[in-house]
């Protein structure tokens, strides 16, 4: 289910909302307004990782915090002039990045949704 508006994106769940300026750092923006990105549609790039062919070029970020939620690690990562929520599978302690760690993010472009303005 994709949100149709900013209100719906905030109501439905933990979507990251990107402005046109923030989104243009990731892909060629066609619309004005906001873009919604689910936390699981953003990947922390790992050496040797395999990612969908629809991913963006890497975007630099810095880990602000992390929260262990069972089989998911929820990160707050500063990137693109905002703090993004990024969810990754908790497969091992080696995947746990400490605050202030520099990371590279990949956005699944097929899952970035423009919102009605």
How would you label these PLM feature ranges?
Residues 15-17, 25-117:
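Non-catalytic connector elements of ABC transporters
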Residues 1-12:
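Conserved beta-strand-loop-alpha-helix hinge in the C-terminal portion
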């Amino acid at each position: 289910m994709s949100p149709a508006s900013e209100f719906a994106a905030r109501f439905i769940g933990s979507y990251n909302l990107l402005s046109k300026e923030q989104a243009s750092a990731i892909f060629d923006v066609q619309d004005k307004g906001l873009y919604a990105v689910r936390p699981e549609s953003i990947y922390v790039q790992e050496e040797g990782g395999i990612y969908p062919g629809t991913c963006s070029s890497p975007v630099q970020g810095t880990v602000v915090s992390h929260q262990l939620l069972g089989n998911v690690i929820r990160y707050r990562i500063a990137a693109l002039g905002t703090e993004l929520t990024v969810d990754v599978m908790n497969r091992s302690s080696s995947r746990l990045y400490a605050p202030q760690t520099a990371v590279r993010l990949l956005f699944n472009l097929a899952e970035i949704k423009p919102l009605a303005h």
